[in-house]
Amino acid sequence: MKKGIHPENYRPVVFKDMSNDDVFITRSTINAKETIEIDGVTYPLVKVEISNTSHPFYTGKSKLVDTAGRVDKFMSRYGNRNKK
């Protein structure tokens, strides 16, 4: 690794999976606006939509994630077309 190009300000940060409310603490340099208290210690909080605890690849369960209505938008544009 090259010297002087990697961040040095790693600190414990809580990542919260919003799809199943799992939380895990890891070291990161990410800036967070929210905080959370766990076991009497306050940590920066980063909310994520999907993590290894809810991703179908890791869980083995299939799940449709449609956060922006993309499937509905596609179906309204192309779903009613007849096959030739």
From Swiss-Prot:
PROSITE patterns: RIBOSOMAL_L31. One of its GO terms (cellular component) is ribosome. GO terms for biological process: translation. The keyword Transport does not apply. InterPro entries: Ribosomal_bL28/bL31-like_sf, Ribosomal_bL31, Ribosomal_bL31_B, Ribosomal_bL31_sf. GO terms for molecular function: structural constituent of ribosome. Keywords: Ribonucleoprotein, Ribosomal protein. Gene3D superfamilies: Ribosomal protein L31. The keyword Ribonucleoprotein applies. Belongs to the bacterial ribosomal protein bL31 family. Type B subfamily. HAMAP family: Ribosomal_bL31_2. Part of the 50S ribosomal subunit. This is Large ribosomal subunit protein bL31B. The gene is rpmE2.
